[in-house]
């Protein structure tokens, strides 16, 4: 209290007591006691002199003015009183005004001199102080009453042995006290006061209570009676609070043992039973299991030996019935950095308050922000912990607001005051205390609280190293408990007798006290071990039984539909991303810059004479297509790799809301797919423009977009499976390099390791690579559907097939037939084996051959399988193969002639064939899909002749309806007996893989596998 206000208050006290007969000795003694309480000893005389001067205490009785003069003085004093009160009114808080009014009433009541003039001045004070009439009457009756029967107010509570003479509206509790302890609640300011009407010796926070004197009953206060009984602040205010009385809530936790994955015991023998309206702290040294205990009680961890029940419902078995009952605020920052204070709270509210309209949600959000003192910061981005635009205390309050917006019945908080200033810490705990007074049950882990904060808790749970509980009860009583347990001299004193402060550090100094060696130096050995403390705890503390409610707990959660959840998640994430300017800039420029760099490097004067750039002769086009796919994979992976890791902490909190995991994933995928669509389009637009790839923009974009979407889902999988962004980014090269190796470009599929390779077809291991499907689709589509080639593709296919059969297959079959003629009677087993292979090859090729002119009429099965081959048949086959070769030469020539005629027709109609070919056709790509660079045009593999040349012109040869496998670069694929374009078939495959990995993401298969592997590793170490 400032000097100016204290002088004004002194004048006010003097004016009141000078009325109607002047100052009595009792009144003056009351003022002296007040000054001694508020001032240093040296200043008491100065203020007492001021009081005596104004009150006229030193005047003789004969010097008093007559009655008429007294009345005039009274009027003057009333005006002066009004002026003083207005002056005080501008400085004191409402709580301080209530205390001043009580002191004034105590002063008047000290001599029972209730005159009209004094009463009028006191009424003036209460009016100027804006104290409601009901509360003034309550305070006046409380301060002046000698009989409890006159205190007929609902804000009065009587503690005594027998409820005799109780007024109808009063509350009553039983207490072993002679006389009556009278408690008063001033609801408007949330303050409690106590008077003792009796002759016994009771102590309040260690001070002897003078009978009839009014005392502030503040947070953490304890009244002790002569018989050793105690009345705690937390228990008494619960009797005042109607919300606590009407809330049906019970929380019972019985945790016999909890082990971590590595087998270490984290929690032992914990039993907690609580009802509504409690603020309960959990303290302990580092590694004592505070956060573990909190997580078990919140349901984040499951104890193998123990249960946690809310209103009789198991938190793990009855999740649906307990939906929305629990709230959790972790020690970590759970804010979305890119959103504003308002947006963080608004989108959270939309996810849990679906029953409210948009206007109602907006109103509630603004109200919560105002209550937390954040309304002036609502439009600021919260930023990161390091790059922050709001203070640490404001961040903590906003984190708590995420749960307060829906007001769960039970709230768990992990060190909500860590890293905060003492003022911010008090604000946070004040907020939680107010919430507990509304009937909520709150548990929080706290570290090194101040005295004021420590006394705000209703109960304190103390944990010791190894997960042992060693105390469970009133916070202030904990100090005396541990002092008595260690036989300290001042064991009866729990707080400072002068200021009332408590020192929580004292508790840990006692708990962790070390044994001193013979040199007076502390050793590492503790005087009392955790087990010994726990044994004392078990013998002295029993969880007070509470009524186990059977009703479904009060629900404050209203979840929107899954579709609406998806929309809210998407809106929130989209807003966060567009608000992050560096993120947006990098992701928007990444693709066009890479395309520009890549296309610029590989564009050169490719004309045969080196004079200009011609697309047809650019040998880098196949490599560009491969790099386009790798870039699409890279962008898709990098943009999604941190998405779930970044949200991991937020997801942990939102797990209590039972929101749809699928809705969350769909929101992520929607935004990532949109971003991938933009990135791949800008890449293709820039790359195709520079390299003059014409007519392929949308076809290439669809492939790259599909590839990038696949990478998005893969990135989300690894983001879900691992907890470290570093791990994820280390994995990206491990994912991309196999995609390059097995793309079919760097290494020939026919020349891979024999364990992997399947000659003539793409290996199964390569079929797992998206790059293989994407690259094949792009190259085949570019060759088959470019503006130049698409008119001739059908003819060239027939031409290529005829050329292969006449030039390569006929010759190979002829050689096989000659070999059989030369070895009609095999000399040894090795020759016999070669003979059988040749027969097998001839049989397989001839049984499906459409050209049969000159083919022996004998049954092919009889000839080649059942040893029916003779010299006569061999000679007939020799003549047949000659005819076979000539037949396909004719087909080849006919199709070549058709192509020439078609070209001639186009040229005759004004088309520049050469220009068209230069613009749309690429020689290197053509050589790639035709495989003209290979020396082997046909090869034998496992009794089959495999065509190596011209895979683009081959037709699929499925062995069964589901047989999709075919040579690389084939133009068409088999799908359930139907022939489908390779481009669309490969698109379908990539989207199928994407869907498969989405299911893996939804069910978290990879995360579970990583978890199993981690557990297996831990078991090996053990």
Which role does the model predict for each range below?
Residues 411-415:
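Catalytic Walker B motif of ABC-type/P-loop ATPase nucleotide-binding domains
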Residues 1-187:
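Small-residue-enriched hydrophobic alpha-helices in membranes
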Residues 307-321:
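ABC ATPase NBD Q-loop/coupling interface
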Residues 298:
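Helix-to-loop junction immediately C-terminal to a conserved catalytic motif
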Residues 438-445, 450-454, 459, 663, ...:
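Alpha-helical transmembrane segments and their short interhelical loops
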Residues 403-404:
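ABC ATPase C-loop
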Residues 163-200, 204-205, 217-219, 226, ...:
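Topological signature of polytopic alpha-helical transporters
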Residues 337-354, 364:
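Q-loop/switch helix immediately C-terminal to the Walker
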């Amino acid at each position: 209290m400032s000097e100016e206000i204290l002088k004004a208050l002194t004048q006010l006290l003097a004016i009141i007591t000078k009325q109607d007969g002047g100052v009595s000795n009792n009144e003056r003694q009351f003022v002296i006691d007040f000054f001694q309480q508020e001032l240093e000893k040296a200043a008491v005389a100065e203020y007492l002199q001021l009081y005596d001067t104004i009150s006229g205490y030193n005047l003789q009785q004969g010097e008093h003015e007559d009655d008429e003069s007294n009345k005039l003085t009274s009027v003057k004093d009333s005006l002066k009183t009004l002026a003083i009160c207005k002056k005080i009114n501008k400085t004191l808080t409402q709580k301080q005004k209530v205390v001043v009014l009580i002191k004034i009433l105590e002063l008047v009541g000290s001599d029972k001199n209730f005159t009209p003039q004094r009463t009028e001045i006191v009424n003036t004070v209460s009016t100027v102080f804006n104290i409601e009439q009901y509360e003034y009457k309550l305070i006046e009756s409380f301060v002046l009453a000698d009989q409890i029967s006159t205190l007929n107010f609902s804000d009065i509570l009587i503690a005594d042995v027998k409820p005799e003479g109780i007024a109808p509206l009063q509350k009553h509790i039983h207490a072993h006290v002679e006389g009556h302890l009278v408690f008063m609640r001033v609801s408007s300011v949330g303050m409690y006061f106590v008077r003792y009407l009796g002759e016994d010796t009771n102590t309040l926070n260690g001070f002897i209570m003078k009978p009839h004197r009014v005392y502030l009953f503040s947070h953490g206060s304890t009244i002790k009676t002569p018989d050793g009984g105690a009345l705690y602040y937390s228990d008494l205010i619960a009797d005042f609070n109607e919300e606590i009385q009407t809330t049906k809530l019970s929380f019972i936790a019985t945790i016999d043992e909890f082990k971590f994955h590595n087998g270490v015991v984290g929690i032992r023998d914990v039993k907690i039973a609580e009802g509504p309206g409690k603020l309960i702290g959990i303290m302990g040294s580092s590694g004592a299991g505070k956060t573990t205990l909190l997580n078990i009680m919140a349901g984040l961890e499951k104890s193998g030996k123990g249960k946690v029940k809310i209103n009789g419902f198991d938190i793990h078995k009855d999740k649906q019935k307990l939906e929305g009952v629990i709230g959790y605020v972790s020690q970590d920052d759970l804010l979305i950095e890119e959103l504003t204070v308002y947006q963080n709270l608004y989108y959270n509210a939309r996810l849990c308050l679906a029953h409210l309209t948009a206007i109602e949600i907006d109103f509630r959000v603004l109200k919560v922000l105002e209550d937390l003192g954040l309304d002036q910061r609502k439009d600021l981005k919260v930023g990161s912990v390091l790059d922050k635009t709001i203070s640490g205390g404001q961040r903590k309050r906003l984190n708590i607001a995420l749960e307060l917006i829906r007001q769960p019945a039970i709230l768990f908080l992990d060190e909500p005051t860590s890293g905060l200033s003492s003022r911010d810490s008090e604000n946070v705990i004040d907020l939680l205390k107010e919430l507990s007074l509304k009937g909520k049950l709150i548990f929080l882990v706290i570290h090194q609280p101040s005295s004021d904060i420590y006394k705000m808790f209703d109960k304190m749970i103390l944990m010791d190293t190894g997960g042992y509980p060693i105390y469970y009860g009133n916070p202030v009583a904990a100090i005396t408990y541990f002092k008595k347990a260690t036989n300290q001299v001042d064991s009866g004193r729990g707080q400072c007798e002068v200021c009332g402060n408590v020192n929580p550090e004292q508790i840990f100094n006692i708990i962790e006290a070390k044994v001193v060696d013979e040199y007076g130096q502390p050793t590492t050995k503790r005087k009392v071990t955790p087990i010994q403390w726990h044994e004392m705890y078990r013998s002295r503390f029993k969880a007070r039984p509470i009524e186990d409610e059977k009703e479904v707990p009060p629900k404050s959660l209203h979840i929107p539909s899954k579709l609406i959840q998806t929309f809210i998640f998407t809106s929130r994430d989209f807003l966060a991303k567009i608000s992050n300017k560096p993120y947006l800039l990098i992701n928007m420029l990444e693709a066009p810059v890479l395309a520009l760099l890549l296309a610029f490097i590989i564009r050169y004067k490719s004309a045969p004479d080196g004079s200009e750039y011609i697309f047809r002769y650019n040998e880098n086009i196949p490599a560009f297509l491969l790099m386009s796919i790798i870039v699409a994979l890279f962008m898709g992976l990098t943009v999604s790799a941190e998405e779930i890791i970044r949200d991991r902490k937020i997801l942990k909190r939102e797990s209590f809301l039972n929101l749809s995991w699928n809705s969350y994933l769909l929101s992520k995928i929607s935004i990532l797919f949109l971003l991938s669509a933009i990135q791949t389009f800008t890449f293709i637009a820039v790359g195709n423009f520079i390299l003059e790839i014409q007519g392929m923009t949308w076809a290439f974009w669809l492939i790259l977009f599909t590839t990038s979407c696949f990478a998005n889902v893969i990135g989300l999988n690894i983001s879900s499976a691992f907890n470290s962004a570093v791990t994820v980014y280390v994995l990206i090269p491990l994912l991309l390099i196999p995609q390059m190796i097995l793309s079919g470009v760097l290494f020939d599929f026919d020349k891979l390791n024999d364990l992997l390779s399947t000659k003539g077809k793409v290996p199964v291991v390569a079929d797992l690579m998206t790059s293989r499907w994407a690259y094949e689709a792009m190259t085949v589509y570019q060759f088959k559907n470019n503006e130049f080639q698409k008119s001739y593709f059908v003819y060239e296919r027939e031409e290529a097939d005829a050329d292969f059969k006449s030039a390569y297959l006929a010759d190979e079959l002829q050689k096989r037939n000659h070999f059989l003629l030369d070895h009609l009677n095999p000399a040894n087993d090795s020759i016999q084996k070669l003979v059988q292979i040749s027969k097998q090859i001839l049989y397989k090729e001839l049984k499906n051959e459409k050209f049969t002119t000159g083919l022996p009429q004998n049954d092919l099965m009889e000839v080649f399988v059942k040893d029916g081959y003779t010299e006569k048949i061999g000679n007939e086959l020799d003549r047949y193969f000659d005819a076979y070769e000539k037949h396909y030469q004719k087909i080849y020539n006919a199709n070549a002639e058709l192509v020439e005629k078609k070209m001639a027709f186009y040229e005759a109609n004004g088309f520049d064939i050469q220009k068209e070919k230069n613009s749309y056709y690429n020689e290197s790509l053509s050589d790639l899909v035709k495989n003209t660079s290979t020396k082997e045009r046909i090869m034998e593999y496992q009794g089959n002749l495999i065509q190596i040349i011209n895979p683009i012109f081959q037709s699929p040869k499925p062995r069964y309806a589901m047989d999709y496998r075919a040579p690389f670069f084939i133009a068409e694929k088999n799908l359930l007996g139907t022939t489908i374009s390779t481009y669309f078939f490969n698109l379908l495959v990539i989207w199928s893989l994407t869907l498969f990995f989405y299911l893996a993401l939804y069910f978290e298969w990879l995360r579970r596998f990583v978890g199993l592997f981690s557990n297996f590793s831990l078991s090996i170490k053990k």
